[in-house]
Design a protein with these regions (language model features):
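Generic protein-terminus/edge-of-domain signal
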Residues: 1-58, 62, 75-77, 101, ...
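Alpha-helical structural segments
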Residues: 176, 224-228, 277
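A hydrophobic/aromatic-rich effector-binding and dimerization subdomain
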Residues: 1-22, 65-134, 148-160
Length: 280
């Protein structure tokens, strides 16, 4: 399993208004953003969650996250390779919330539903972005528009805009909760505290959170904490106990337990690996 933080950093580092890349065994925590995101499974299989739906996708399948969708990728105990495309529609002359006048009938599409023209446009984008042929920026602009047209032409969709139900499962509420957690995960965060802050019943919040993120609150927070800790272990000489407390763990024991569960090894083992690589 490729660790979540590594995927998160590599995607953000290479991404501006457009980004396309290949990821092996990606596991990426539930998140949301205003950009359009498409994941095409080249090989193997993985779990993908989008809003309240979670499916296991295989080679040839496609997943689409439109602006504001909460989504995650999970390759735990699986092997997968995906092409991940993220772009700002407005950068290409489209509405920021494209598709703005239609709604895709689903977020997941099986291999037989993915037309060859969609695959061709996607691989052409990957080639132009990787090899930087002459005038590749213009070709990328043209191919993004071609891909969007192919998605609308060949995937089932219907007129209308995306609507959120006025309930605790409201994605806008969960977006706010996720943003708060990401900005404050090193502090003490409990279900009761979140329910008071966002004025929602704790049972309903917990149920909606699990449904959308695929994890309970504690595991989600610990994943963020361990991700930051891994970065600090690999890039600083801070004592591990200091890192544990800085990332929000209240004891070295709880840090060791969470780190081993999520990465498969202890923090000290991670540091030893880093030291050995630096000495080579």
């Amino acid at each position: 399993m490729k660790f979540f933080f590594e995927d998160r950093v590599s995607i953000r580092r290479n991404y501006s208004s457009f980004g396309i890349s290949i990821h092996d065994n990606i596991s990426y925590q539930a998140h949301w953003h205003p950009e359009f995101e498409l994941a095409y499974v080249e090989a193997g299989s993985l779990w993908v969650g989008i809003n309240n739906n979670r499916q296991k996708l295989a080679a040839g399948d496609l997943a689409i996250s439109v602006s504001g969708d909460i989504h995650f990728y999970d390759s735990t105990d699986l092997d997968s390779r995906i092409i991940l495309l993220i772009f700002k529609p407005e950068f290409f002359g489209l509405a920021a919330d494209w598709p703005d006048t239609r709604q895709f009938a689903a977020s997941f599409f099986k291999k037989h539903e993915v037309h060859d023209q969609i695959r061709t446009a996607l691989y052409s984008l990957l080639d132009e972005n990787q090899n930087k042929h002459d005038y590749y920026e213009l070709f990328i602009r043209a191919k993004v528009i071609e891909l969007c047209a192919a998605l609308l032409r060949f995937l089932p969709s219907y007129p209308g805009v995306k609507e959120h139900k006025n309930s605790v499962s409201n994605l806008e509420l969960l977006q706010e909760v996720l943003m708060y957690i990401e900005n404050n995960f090193s502090e003490e965060i409990t279900l009761e505290m979140l329910s008071k802050r966002f004025k929602v019943d704790p049972f309903n919040l917990s149920k909606a959170f699990n449904s959308v993120t695929g994890k309970n609150l504690r595991t989600y927070i610990n994943t963020l904490r361990v991700a930051k800790a891994q970065s600090l272990i690999q890039t600083t000489n801070q004592p591990i106990i200091n890192i544990a407390f800085e990332c929000g763990f209240n004891s070295i024991r709880s840090f060791n337990r969470a780190n081993k569960r999520l990465t498969g090894q202890s923090p000290s083992a991670t540091r030893s690996e880093v030291s050995q690589k630096q000495q080579k």
